[in-house]
Amino acid sequence: MTELSAHLPQFQHGQMTENFPDNHLSNTNDNSERRRHDNSERRRNDNPGSETNGQPQNNIQQVVDQDEEEDEELTLKYGAKHVIMLFVPVTLCMVVVVATIKSVSFYTRKDGQLIYTPFTEETDTIGQRALNSILNAAIMISVIIVMTILLVVLYKYRCYKVIHGWLIISSLLLLFFFSFIYLGEVFKTYNVAMDYITVALIIWNFGVVGMICIHWKGPLRLQQAYLIMISALMALVFIKYLPEWTAWLILAVISVYDLVAVLCPKGPLRMLVETAQERNETLFPALIYSSTMVWLVNMAEEDPEGQRKASKNSTYDKQAPANQSQNEDAEADDGGFSQEWQQQRDNRIGPIESTPESRAAVQALPSNSQTSEDPEERGVKLGLGDFIFYSVLVGKASATASGDWNTTLACFVAILIGLCLTLLLLAIFKKALPALPISITFGLVFYFATDNLVQPFMDQLAFHQFYI
């Protein structure tokens, strides 16, 4: 911009004039300069579209083409790259759940139900079972809706400390209590003898490191691993304590609710995302899995505006002595731009004079000085609830399909296909989209189709020893 402004003509009273350094030149020289200037103006008038703001249009077109190519490269890079970076954690979460369901009988044994599903499905008639499952699903979805609205209201009114405490308590339960139960059942299944002191040390280290990585700072891979683990633990709890028909109904209804909550103008999840974007804040890492690092430090401040102003003032105070020292250094070391160099430049192109018109013209030029998004902030973000319900679907399919791997793999592939289509729509519409509807719909269709059509067909083929 500095080099470009040196060649900008001055616009005064609607006429284009230039200042030349030699005021002692004769009238003949002045006339010759005027003639050359008039000839240059005629050439510009003959080619009116040749220059714009001192830049040829060909160069501008090249810059636009380069920007478009860079945008396409970024779309491909941060599109396909982050699709793969989301496939891996979703796959890992579902693999952990399925492996646990297949090996640890504790999570397939019916020992009770959640308090949110009070109606039992152990009934004499199918109609009564269907009614009880509908009531259980309605209560569960109502609890989810109320909790979501409460979270949005707290975030809307900047109750960050309340939300943070809520999430910390939830993380403590998952990382310590449910992890202790999970580890104990795994040791029982594989007949591993372990004393309580060693188990306590393992759980303590696991939980403390997880709390630090999730709610403060930690390596990206470690944070992602903990988010995957707590999602798998929560999914295992749902798989164990949700009745079969209730679980399928909840999955169907939660996908519809996710669609409404994200896409409706007054949907709670949409309001949450829009509020975070308006405040230029990241959502809590305990709620969101990101393919890039998300740290949460100093969000729970009572007056973020005042904090921002104070930080700006402190920045200016710190920059003032630095600028003074830089000026002193510039006087001692001119970096090659000495007085002789400036005089030679003035002799070649004339003195550079700044006027309000020239400054306005320079400021009107396109600038690339806008703050670009930090590479760490790029990436696709997926809610932990999506991980949980994906894993619940695959885990329930694995637990209730009589040990059939075909149904489990069909649901697994269906969820990944739905996630891929969701990310494709995300790249097209470039706004927050629900991740559950497509994947859950495909998963439910594949589950019932495979369990009721494909598996009996394959059993008959195996019975009659037919090979296709």
Swiss-Prot record:
Cellular location(s): Endoplasmic reticulum membrane; Golgi apparatus membrane; Cytoplasmic granule; Cell membrane
Annotated Basic and acidic residues bias: 31-46
Composition bias, Polar residues: 12-30, 48-60, 312-327
Description of how the protein assembles with itself and partners: Homodimer. The functional gamma-secretase complex is composed of at least four polypeptides: a presenilin homodimer (PSEN1 or PSEN2), nicastrin (NCSTN), APH1 (APH1A or APH1B) and PEN2. Such minimal complex is sufficient for secretase activity. Predominantly heterodimer of a N-terminal (NTF) and a C-terminal (CTF) endoproteolytical fragment. Interacts with CDH2.
PTM annotation: Heterogeneous proteolytic processing generates N-terminal (NTF) and C-terminal (CTF) fragments of approximately 35 and 20 kDa, respectively. During apoptosis, the C-terminal fragment (CTF) is further cleaved by a caspase.
Motif (PAL): 434-436
Protein family according to the UniProt entry: Belongs to the peptidase A22A family.
Recorded GO MF terms: aspartic endopeptidase activity, intramembrane cleaving
Domain-level remarks: The PAL motif is required for normal active site conformation.
Disulfide bond positions: none
Gene: PSEN1
GO biological process, one term: calcium ion homeostasis
Parts of the chain on the Cytoplasmic side: 1-83, 155-167, 218-221, 274-381, 430-433
Descriptive protein name: Presenilin-1
The UniProt record lists the keyword Amino-acid biosynthesis: no
Positions bearing the site annotation: Cleavage: T292, M293, V294, M299, A300, D346, N347
Biological source species: Gallus gallus
Membrane protein topology class: Multi-pass membrane protein
Lumenal side: 105-133, 191-195, 243-249, 403-408, 455-468
Spans traversing the lipid bilayer: 84-104, 134-154, 168-190, 196-217, 222-242, 250-273, 382-402, 409-429, 434-454
Main location per the UniProt record: endoplasmic reticulum
Ranges where the record places region Important for cleavage of target proteins: 289-291, 378-382, 433-435
Record's function text: Catalytic subunit of the gamma-secretase complex, an endoprotease complex that catalyzes the intramembrane cleavage of integral membrane proteins such as Notch receptors and APP (amyloid-beta precursor protein). Requires the presence of the other members of the gamma-secretase complex for protease activity. Plays a role in Notch and Wnt signaling cascades and regulation of downstream processes via its role in processing key regulatory proteins.
